[in-house]
Amino acid sequence: MGKDIKDEILSLRDAIKKWDREYYVDSSPTVGDVTYDKALLRLQYLENRYPEYKTLDSPTLKFGSDLLNDFKEVEHSYPILSLDKAYDVKELLLWVEKMSLEGSNLGFDMGISAEPKIDGCSIVLYYKDGILEKALTRGDGRFGNNVIENVRTIKNVPLCIGERVELVLRGEIYITKKDFLKINHTLDDSYINARNLTSGILRRINSREVVNFPLDIFVYDILYSSLELNTNHDAFDKLKHFGFKLNPFCKFFCGKNLGENIINYVKEIEEQRERFEYEIDGVVLKVDDFRLRDVLGYTSHHPKWSIAYKFESLRAVSKVIDIVVQVGRSGKITPVANIEKVLIAGAFITSASLHNQDYIDSIGLNVKDVVAISRRGDVIPAVELVVEKLSVGNFKIPNYCPSCKKSLIKEGAHLFCVNIHCPLKIMGHIKYFCSKKCMNIVGLSEKTIEFLFNMNFISSEIDLYTFDFDRLIGLKGFNFKRVNKLKRSIEESKNRPFKKLLLAMGIKDLGINTILLLINNNLNSFDAISLLCQDNKNALVKLLDIKGIGERIAFNIIRAFNDKIILDKFNFFKGLGFKMQEDSINCVVDSSFLFGKKFCITGSFDEYPRHVLIDKITKKGAIFNSSVSRYLDFLLVGKSPGLKLKKANNLGIKILSLFDIKNLVNLDD
């Protein structure tokens, strides 16, 4: 009996996977909807009755689940970088010529892959032994949220690829223009564009709801593969074989007239832009040969072997209804134009930043004027010019703060409120503190913070940890369940890493990259930084010794750690048990041979996957470089090394094996 049930389940599963491929990949279905639905319902019934036979690659997972997702934050195995950008064809042509020259000098025949840049939500798919193991959002490039339960519901995401291989893939999840307009019309809270709607659907906590939305995906890049793949177009052939959906407008270019042919392709895609059923905002070019990519390497921001050509922003005409003045957490004053609602590139626009008084004067703008509106980079609304002047004179920003009424000061082209008690500045600090990039207090939206602040329930970040949130129960929008969720989120925030707390303090010029520089130079705790800053002169010398920290940043760090208000906040959080030091796993070890050494890797290793080995070495204080340059301290060489070894030898860089490294330092402690 058991064997018969298991055999039927396996047979149904194989049949449904075959039909899925015929329908979604080959576009040639061999069975009708009734047959398909009947088989899927039978499989679902059997798996529910015999759960011991259910597997992670079952097609029934496409139905979703009623279990609530918690979207845990997970570290990416590889940094998820941005792309270099070009905004005109001359810039793009220069990049193509540069890649061709570098490829030729290294003995490569240049080939370039091109494809439309989808304006959706980036996702990273991890396959282990051929089965989808996790699906991470891009997040901050280092950490993303695992939304696998929701991604499993997307029909064009294979749950199993039929071979026991490991893959890490990048893709773009999207919703078509037609579906966006149809769905958005039915929602209580509508979305500004298709990308935001896609993101909202992807983050729904109940995957049974997600299955009802027509999300789709294009896979466009391989970050890691256990297969031997040498080129992008070979990789795409393999991905198509596995059942992944690839953009049909992808094209490969090589040979004579390379630059001219690519520019013609880009212009053709841009001309057809409005005919695409989904939003696109440019074209992405990638060097086709993976070995050449390996040599070209990366910056901290983007791969050198790829570039995105951004289309010129679409424009529309609207009328300025009003101009309001906003105050940021730094006190910066920003004028904003409220305009009559207009649709641009799939998004409804109702406001646009005017930057400063100089910008307003340069375009001669005032209330009632008719203006041309764009979305720069298809993201940021901008007033480009006055089409019809219906007012007299230009709008003038008041010389006092709209929040606290104190006089403003001018720094460069911008006006600032320097009153530390300014309500809007304080509220901006609280919003920043709670934001996802900082303490990530789920449930404390900007609207909720504004309500709590305006009701005098909170007046600083500290109040979030002293206020009795039970007082909110019974108020409009605050039931017992929501209040408990808020309390739980606030409590969980106490466990954030020290670097997040340091970022959340909003210290001028102290962004995450500077914080990581401090941590990697033994300034990895509140006590270490505050102790150093007690001696201003010594602190300045020490900070300026850190590559990447200049005088302005150093002075702002010293000033902040001598500010009583900031120190009192740190001490308050310390008293609540917040982490005031980076966990040892993230901190460098000063005594290690590897501390401060810049290294690169080529070849493969039996003992560790490359990304694991890189992680182990960087935790000893070394700095990983993705490409070989004269600044490298050593190249770690494994089996079947690539062209990096030749380049390192030419530059006289020290060559080490894994055996050499392990003789010098214990990687596993």
From Swiss-Prot:
List of residues binding Zn(2+):
C401, C404, C417, C422
Q: Which InterPro entries match?
A: BRCT_dom, BRCT_dom_sf, DNA_ligase, DNAligase_adenylation, DNAligase_N, NA-bd_OB-fold, NAD_DNA_ligase_OB, RuvA_2-like
Return the EC number: 6.5.1.2
Please give the biological process terms from Gene Ontology that the record holds.
DNA repair; DNA replication
Keyword annotations from UniProtKB, A to Z:
DNA damage, DNA repair, DNA replication, Ligase, Magnesium, Manganese, Metal-binding, NAD, Zinc
Name the cofactor(s). Answer: Mg(2+); Mn(2+)
Q: Could you tell me which Gene3D superfamilies the record lists for this protein?
A: 5' to 3' exonuclease, C-terminal subdomain (1.10.150.20), BRCT domain (3.40.50.10190), DNA ligase/mRNA capping enzyme (3.30.470.30), Helix hairpin bin (1.10.287.610), Nucleic acid-binding proteins (2.40.50.140)
Q: Which reaction(s) does the protein catalyse, per the Swiss-Prot or TrEMBL entry?
A: NAD(+) + (deoxyribonucleotide)n-3'-hydroxyl + 5'-phospho-(deoxyribonucleotide)m = (deoxyribonucleotide)n+m + AMP + beta-nicotinamide D-nucleotide
Does the entry feature the keyword Metal-binding, yes or no?
yes
Keyword Nucleotide-binding appears in the UniProt entry: no
Known Pfam families for this protein?
BRCT, DNA_ligase_aden, DNA_ligase_OB
| Annotated ranges, domain BRCT | 589-669
- Residues involved in NAD(+) binding: D33, V34, T35, Y36, D37, S82, L83, E115, R138, E172, K286, K310
The top EC class, named as a word, is ligase
Listed GO MF terms:
DNA ligase (NAD+) activity; metal ion binding
What this protein is reported to do is described as: DNA ligase that catalyzes the formation of phosphodiester linkages between 5'-phosphoryl and 3'-hydroxyl groups in double-stranded DNA using NAD as a coenzyme and as the energy source for the reaction. It is essential for DNA replication and repair of damaged DNA.
UniProt similarity note: Belongs to the NAD-dependent DNA ligase family. LigA subfamily.
> Any idea what this protein is called?
DNA ligase
Species, as recorded: Borrelia duttonii (strain Ly)
Tell me the gene name: ligA
